[in-house]
């Protein structure tokens, strides 16, 4: 034998029939996998031979072989009525008979693959038009030989295509076969050892990768937290920008409000000038009504009591201001205002003393001049006291026009202009019923309506209240004190 050519080397699905007794028809059958090799070789005289060899992976001693030359094939073809020649026979059985029974086997790496997909077996062509076949292997009881049979199967029958006898391989050939299997198993074991080492290395790498992945996950969480913090800081920055914009808008509104207050101050100054003119007119009218001052003497005592009440109210307000000054940041300004109020009170006390002295002088003059002169001087003193009351009422009227009274303090209701005018001048005064003399006072109802409109249109602010509290020409809305008469008659 000079050379060998492997025509077929695949694992087939077959039925193994093993005789259990001497009865030639009594077999024990079970499914198994056998490996079939078809080798093309040259004999001793150079003739072409086909070697059929079957083996099993689960039974190393299961090895049967048969050599088929042209002469033996002719006997086989005659016995089974084969229609192909010796050269075509292997190709036909491989492509049309054996291909239906090829099964997947595990390669050297332990992965199952279809042998038909391996390179080098291009001659295996699966013909879908060929009916399925069945392979039977009849094993003799002594296991020295077996019968290799191929059947064609139809839905209703099964027919034998051919059968050939294979002899058990023993001796050196079996030893060589076993050595080949051992070598293959050793190679697989070495491969498994390498795979085990690689698996251990991979496990170590996997553990390292898991640690890295865990650290990466921690970093990702930290990054997410940082991103969330950045978003929160951006939101806070937007809020700060909005607050700055709101502060700017409020500052502009405050500037506009200050400008409006300045305009209001100018208008108040103009009204004060007008009120001064009105006071001058009232002074002239009071001079003409000196004869009626005797009726006002009795009111002096009542006004003295009212002054004492005002002083008590002033003391209460002073104590309240002291308590509130501790809580306010502008303590120095409140103290200065308190001093101004004290100065106003002293000035008003001096006015009361002056009025009292004037009353005494008038009493002396009334004693010198007879009963009429005495009544005139008494009326004159009473008229002066009533003048202060009128000024106080005018101041209270201004306070009610320009700003509301502070919380907790009582306000004095302004009497109607007509009633107060008649009370001061008397029923027998030539100016009492003269409509022309009412012009300097302006219409009381319109003034009240104007004051209400002005009060509703302008919201009083603390600065406005402080201005009115500190203005000694209009009096104080806190202590309910009358205004200071700059040019007393």
From Swiss-Prot:
Complex and partners: Nine homodimers form a cartwheel structure with an internal diameter of 23 nM and radial spokes connecting to the microtubule triplets. Interacts with sas-5.
Polar residues composition-biased segments: 473-482
Protein's recorded name: Spindle assembly abnormal protein 6
Any one GO biological process: protein localization
Domain PISA: 45-97
Region described as Disordered: 470-489
InterPro entries according to UniProt: Sas-6_helical, SAS-6_N, SAS-6_N_sf
Major location category of this protein: cytoplasm
Gene Ontology CC terms: centriole; centrosome; cytoplasm
Domain writeup: The coiled coil domain is necessary and sufficient for interaction with sas-5. The 35 nM long coiled-coil domain mediates homodimerization while the globular N-terminus links the dimers at an angle of 40 degrees to form the inner ring.
GO molecular function annotation: identical protein binding; protein domain specific binding
Subcellular location: Cytoplasm; Cytoplasm, Cytoskeleton, Microtubule organizing center, Centrosome, Centriole
Role: Central scaffolding component of the centrioles ensuring their 9-fold symmetry. Required for centrosome biogenesis and duplication.
Pfam family, one: SAS-6_N
Domain of life: Eukaryota
Keyword Metal-binding: no
UniProt entry tagged with the keyword Chaperone: no
Sorted UniProt keywords: Cell cycle, Coiled coil, Cytoplasm, Cytoskeleton, Developmental protein
Coiled coil region boundaries: 187-409
Matching PANTHER family: SPINDLE ASSEMBLY ABNORMAL PROTEIN 6 HOMOLOG (PTHR44281:SF2)
């Amino acid at each position: 034998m000079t050379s060998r050519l492997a025509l077929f080397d695949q694992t087939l699905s077959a039925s193994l029939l093993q005789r259990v007794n001497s009865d030639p028809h009594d077999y024990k059958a079970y499914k198994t996998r056998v490996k079939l090799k078809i080798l093309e070789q040259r004999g001793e005289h150079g003739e072409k031979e086909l070697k059929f060899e079957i083996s099993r992976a689960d039974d190393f001693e299961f090895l049967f072989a048969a050599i088929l030359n042209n002469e033996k094939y002719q006997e086989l073809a005659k016995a089974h009525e084969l229609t192909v020649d010796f050269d075509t026979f292997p190709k036909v059985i491989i492509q049309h008979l054996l291909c239906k029974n090829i099964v997947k086997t595990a390669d050297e790496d332990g992965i199952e693959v279809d042998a038909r997909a391996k390179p080098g077996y291009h001659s295996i062509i699966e013909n879908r038009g060929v009916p399925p076949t069945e392979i039977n292997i009849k094993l003799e009881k002594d296991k020295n030989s077996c019968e290799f049979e191929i059947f064609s199967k139809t839905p209703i029958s099964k027919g034998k295509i051919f059968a050939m006898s294979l002899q058990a391989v023993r001796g050196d050939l079996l030893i060589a076969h076993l050595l080949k299997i051992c070598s293959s198993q050793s190679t697989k074991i070495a491969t498994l050892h390498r795979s085990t080492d690689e698996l251990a290395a991979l496990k170590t790498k996997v553990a390292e990768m898991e640690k890295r992945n865990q650290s990466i996950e921690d970093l990702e969480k930290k990054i997410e937290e940082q991103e969330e913090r950045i978003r929160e800081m951006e939101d806070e920055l937007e809020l700060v920008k909005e607050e700055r914009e709101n502060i700017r808008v409020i500052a502009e509104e405050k500037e506009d409000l200050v400008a409006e207050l300045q305009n209001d101050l100018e208008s108040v100054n103009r009204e004060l000038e007008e009120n001064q003119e009105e006071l001058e007119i009232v002074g002239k009218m009071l001079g003409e009504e000196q004869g009626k001052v005797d009726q006002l003497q009795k009111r002096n005592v009542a006004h003295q009591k009212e002054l004492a009440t005002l002083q008590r109210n002033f003391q209460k307000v002073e104590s309240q201001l002291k308590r509130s000054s501790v809580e306010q940041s502008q303590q120095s300004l409140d103290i200065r205002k308190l001093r101004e109020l004290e100065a106003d009170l002293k000035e008003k006390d001096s006015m009361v003393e002056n009025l009292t002295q004037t009353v005494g002088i008038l009493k002396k003059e009334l004693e010198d001049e007879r009963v009429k002169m005495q009544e005139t001087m008494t009326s004159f003193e009473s008229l002066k006291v009533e003048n202060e009351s009128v000024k106080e009422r005018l101041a209270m009227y201004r306070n009610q026009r320009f700003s509301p009274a502070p919380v907790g303090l009582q306000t004095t209701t302004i009497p109607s202009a007509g009633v107060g005018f008649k009370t001061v001048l008397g029923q027998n005064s030539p100016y009492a019923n003269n409509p022309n003399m009412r012009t300097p006072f302006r219409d009381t109802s319109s003034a009240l309506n104007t004051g209400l409109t002005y009060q509703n249109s302008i919201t009083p602010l603390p600065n406005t209240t402080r201005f009115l509290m500190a203005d000694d020409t209009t009096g104080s809305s806190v202590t309910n004190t009358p205004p200071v008469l700059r040019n007393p008659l």
